[in-house]
Amino acid sequence: MSNGQLIYLMVAIAVILVLAYVVAIFLRKRNEGRLEALEEKKEELYNLPVNDEVEAVKNMHLIGQSQVAFREWNQKWVDLSLNSFADIENNLFEAEGYNHSFRFLKASHQIDQIESQITLIEEDIAAIRNALADLEKQESKNSGRVLHALDLFEELQHRVAENSEQYGQALDEIEKQLENIQSEFSQFVTLNSSGDPVEAAVILDNTENHILALSHIVDRVPALVTTLSTELPDQLQDLEAGYRKLIDANYHFVETDIEARFHLLYEAFKKNQENIRQLELDNAEYENGQAQEEINALYDIFTREIAAQKVVENLLATLPTYLQHMKENNTLLGEDIARLNKTYLLPETAASHVRRIQTELESFEAAIVEVTSNQEEPTQAYSVLEENLEDLQTQLKDIEDEQISVSERLTQIEKDDINARQKANVYVNRLHTIKRYMEKRNLPGIPQTFLKLFFTASNNTEDLMVELEQKMINIESVTRVLEIATNDMEALETETYNIVQYATLTEQLLQYSNRYRSFDERIQEAFNEALDIFEKEFDYHASFDKISQALEVAEPGVTNRFVTSYEKTRETIRF
């Protein structure tokens, strides 16, 4: 190694040593600063006036739970002051030794532990001081609370004393609970003044809860007592009185246990007084509700019978008249049937229907007479009579509907006869009119379809007139033949219009085709065929189709133009 290299090496080593020394001095100074701060914090905590606060609470001569709590916190302070601070002192001394001997890592670790110890001690001291402060303040705090509780209690006592009659059977238990609360106040005063404010506070909490609970009870009891002792018995007495009057007035009831239900209600009132006496107010309220529902149910029974009596009275006054009216209607129906039987063949069901109705009316009359005769000494509940009479009224209404139906059918017979005669005359005139209408068309011939329809309609019209000329007219047969004749006339009229329309249009199109025949062989051929069908076969529809199809090729739309023009000027058949 050369001299130059040796010099550089020595300089480097010197620099490293200087840097190491500087770092060591820095770490040492930093640890010393942290240790000084911890020492000051330890002294600050140690010098807190905890001993004075402990002595102040000790001089209160606490007992019971308060004394137990004080001893626990005092022992914790003793442990801290004798052991924890000594441990911190030893750890500080050990950390200083590490720091002076340049064992900085151990010193730093030791300082961290000391900081944790001091933080825990600080928290413990704060908890001890707060607990001591609470013990010291508890007595005065209790004194303020008890004044408010006493005000509530005195107000409650005053309410009960002034309105004692409102509490009924509950008064003894309420007064007993007031005495218990008074005893709790005495127990509180003893504990609070003898050095156990913590236990006294527990007693005061219970006392306040008891006052609030009893206040709620005192609020609820009067209404329950009024309902149970006055309102419900009054309602029941009114019901009993009303029941006696109804019995005296010969009312009967479907329910046979009304007297027993009265007795059960009185027993329920007595039992519920025990709930009031024991301050079982929820049970008392429920039982009051059940009793009210039962009273309402009985009231509904009585009002039902009273209302039913009025309905029965009205029905007994109106049903005989209603029945007599229906009997008269039935007599008229019988007379109508007898009269119509001289002219018409009536179905046997009409007469048998009227006879059956007459039998039913006689049965209903017997039932009404029986009910009416028993009204002076009724043996059934009016609600039962109401149901029976309303059922009877419904049956009478059904029979009346039957009478109306029979009457309408009988009336319809004569209407159908008149209508058929009028239609027969109309159809005869229409046949003549249609015949003249066709003759005026000067057609080369009449199609067989028309002739068949014409003769069929003529024959059926003649059959209708024959039916109407019978000595005993069968109106069902008349109606059937009339329907056939009507359909025939409608078909004949439609066919007449169709024949005349196609014949007229065919003639017009044949004339119009003259402008094309001289140079259009296809139209000339169609003309010849259509004319042949028109004059020989008399199938005017087929003839129209033949010529119109040919013209449509030469002049599209020409057929519709002729059809539209015809429909605007078509001559109708004037019947």
UniProtKB/Swiss-Prot annotation:
Coiled coil: 105-191, 265-301, 354-416, 456-526
InterPro entries assigned: EzrA
Pfam families found in the cross-reference section: EzrA
Ranges that cross the membrane: 9-27
Main location: membrane
Compartments, record wording: Cell membrane
Keyword Transmembrane helix: yes
GO biological process: division septum assembly; septin ring assembly
Residue spans, topological domain Extracellular: 1-8
Keywords carried by this UniProt record: Cell cycle, Cell division, Cell membrane, Coiled coil, Membrane, Septation, Transmembrane, Transmembrane helix
Keyword Coiled coil: yes
Residue spans, topological domain Cytoplasmic: 28-575
Membrane topology (UniProt): Single-pass membrane protein
Gene Ontology CC entries for this record: plasma membrane; septin ring
Family to which the UniProt record says this protein belongs: Belongs to the EzrA family.
Function description: Negative regulator of FtsZ ring formation; modulates the frequency and position of FtsZ ring formation. Inhibits FtsZ ring formation at polar sites. Interacts either with FtsZ or with one of its binding partners to promote depolymerization.
Name of the featured protein: Septation ring formation regulator EzrA
Organism: Streptococcus pneumoniae serotype 4 (strain ATCC BAA-334 / TIGR4)
